[in-house]
């Protein structure tokens, strides 16, 4: 088992190694929040190889791809990337299992219309942002970039998240 760091500060690759599981020990950030406005800074990119399994043990564990950073999770039909719960890894889930961990959240700079951070902001503007719900330490999303790119996810399974 390899526990992921609380924050990836440089681009990294999670390699598929037979028998190795990656663990989210809480909130795991891909890069720092680079704000609502686009910047020229190089993004932190988390690359995940086909067949990698990442699990979380608690409801407060989640992967946050912060604004201005990216994920490249490209599995294959026969070797998908799996994000799941510890109970799933241990074979303890049932058809009713759900909400066992927080999930994968892409915090983009795309326009939002409900400005909760600055309620007086114009919807869809760079000043119109929101916060994630349900997190002890909320993350921000929103901006004015309709074509924002938080990366690519293909052949990815997200199991038992909340």
Regions inferred by a protein language model and the residue ranges of each:
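Beta-strand/loop edge motif enriched in small/polar residues
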Residues: 1-162
């Amino acid at each position: 088992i390899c526990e992921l760091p609380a924050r990836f500060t440089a681009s990294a690759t999670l390699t598929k190694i037979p028998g190795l599981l990656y663990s989210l020990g809480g909130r795991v950030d891909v890069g720092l929040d680079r704000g609502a406005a686009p910047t020229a800074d190089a993004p932190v990119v988390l690359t995940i190889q086909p067949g990698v399994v990442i699990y979380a043990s608690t409801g407060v564990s989640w992967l946050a791809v912060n604004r201005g950073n990216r994920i490249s999770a490209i599995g294959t039909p026969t070797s998908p990337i799996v994000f799941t719960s510890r109970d799933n890894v241990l074979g303890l889930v049932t058809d009713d299992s759900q909400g066992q961990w927080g999930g994968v959240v892409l915090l983009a700079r795309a326009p939002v219309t409900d400005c909760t951070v600055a309620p007086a902001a114009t919807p869809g503007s760079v000043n119109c942002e929101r916060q994630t719900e349900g997190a002890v330490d909320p993350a921000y999303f929103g901006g004015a970039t309709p074509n924002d790119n938080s990366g690519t996810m293909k052949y990815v399974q997200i199991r038992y998240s909340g």
